[in-house]
Amino acid sequence: MVTGVIQAGSTLGIMLPPSVVLVLYGMIARQPVGQLWLAGVGPGFLLAVLFIVYIVIRCHLQPHLGPPLALEERQQITWGEKVRLLRAGIIPLAIIFSMTGLFVIGATSMVESSAIGALAATLVAWGKGRINIRVLNDVLRKSLGVSCMFMWIILAALAFGAVFDGLGAVHAIEVLFLEKWGLEPWHVLVLMQLTYLLMGTFLDDTAMLIIVAPLYIPLIISLGFDPIWYGVLYVITCQIAYITPPFGYNLFLMRAMAPKEITLLDIYKSIIPFVMIMIVGLVLVIVFPEIATWLPERVYGKR
């Protein structure tokens, strides 16, 4: 149960703001990042609620999977410790809001939000006495390296997409699927999601974006689907692929971090219920697109 909860819960990070995956998708798909972030909130909380409901029901039926903390141990936790734990989460939330909140409400641009977030984190580290010239130099070097990496990733994806556009690949695939094979647009969408599930077992989200996004996103738009909504579907499918046996990306990371007595088979068994739940969540977002589109439409208006 514990390994399943850790793996399933960790996948929610790429759905909720400030999701780097949605930022990359927005840049490659030329879609507004603010709307993508807001579109991920509804499905992200939906998956979280589905996880919680499953855990509560499962632990109620099998109490040994999640025994409650002993009364003696709970009494040892003072109100002062609870307040300190609560205060520890306020600063990270404030930093996150300084990046995402100001950008979503239109007070800052994406670049300005990044600078504000970096400045806020630096000030917090300085206030706690955890920063010096050596640390600052190391952070700047690593930040520059990551920024350059993402620049080349986006450049490669855009160049890849331009080549496909120039060759007419999107139109050719549309003709193949819709006219020669007689498929409906929804059939094409399901096939796309299945390819993401397959590739996600051995590739990360960035690699998949570079390989297929330049081809899939123009096709999605030509089929009449909302690219904002599709970005959320892409992220959910990545989440499922990461934890799908036998080659899920996160499964082997969990095996590397878990105690030796927890086998790979145990990890496989623990994650299967959560994979099923995430598939249910994906189907719900496909059938009811408003789960993803309602919030950005309320904030920014209909596109």
Region annotations inferred by a language model:
Residues 1-303:
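Alpha-helical transmembrane segments of multi-pass membrane transport proteins
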